[in-house]
Amino acid sequence: PTRRSSDLTRDLCEIHIGMPTQVFEETRGERGDVPKPERAGKLADVFNRYAGVSYASPGAVQLEKSLIRWMGDLVGYPAGAAGDLTSGGSIANLMGVVAARDAAELKGNQLESSPIYLTEQVHHCVDKAIRIAGLGECPRRIIPMDAGYRMDAEVLAATIQKDKSVGYKPWLIVASAGTTDTGSVDPLETIADIAAFHGIWFHVDAAYGGFFMLSDSARDVLNGIQHSDSVVIDPHKGLFLPYGSGAILVKDGASLHKAHYYDAHYMQDAKTN
């Protein structure tokens, strides 16, 4: 006999509640489990708005812009910053790497002499983003860490100087603000100074630690994040929201636009509305 959908929903909920996850035992999920996002998600499904352009859904686009502006203010970015809500840190890091790549105007024959600087503690999605962005031929300089699993800024500076002395053109530093393994935060202020001195794009993966900017006791640890060129931050981590909700923030909004904007004839009204 046909079962009612309410019966099926109840059965699925009972099965789910009774099955701990393989990653975090004795919990119903890895992240948030709160009712308000569930209700908001249902409303979004009911209205079913396309929020890719303002004229299609001005309210939804303005809501996203307001969220991006709030997060930009949180990390200390200026009014000209831009961003995008994503499905999580993987896509957000990819968008940041692509924005950095296009800002550096890298060409195929330049990749082998254009190093990227990071540590072994960087999230694996950054390596994936580098490959997907067509940057697999760029030398990856794995910078040693101190006893607290933080990037050694002195070694970073020396490595960059060495690369430049042989004609290489450093273009990207990836720092972590809350690593997955240890929660460590790289010395962002010092790294920002090094990046600015050499004219290198400074990207911070703050998917785990970024929202600790809301904490008076932890904010100082993240000092320097405001000097980065791009930041990844995940609401489904620091704000305990359900999957998937990530964000990419770019200080120079024009760089994000340049890297990800495309046009089409059928979208002509988007320019005038």
Model-derived features with residue positions:
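PLP-dependent aminotransferase-class I/II
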Residues: 87, 110-114, 118-175, 182-190
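Catalytic PLP-binding core of fold-type I/II PLP enzymes
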Residues: 155, 184-216
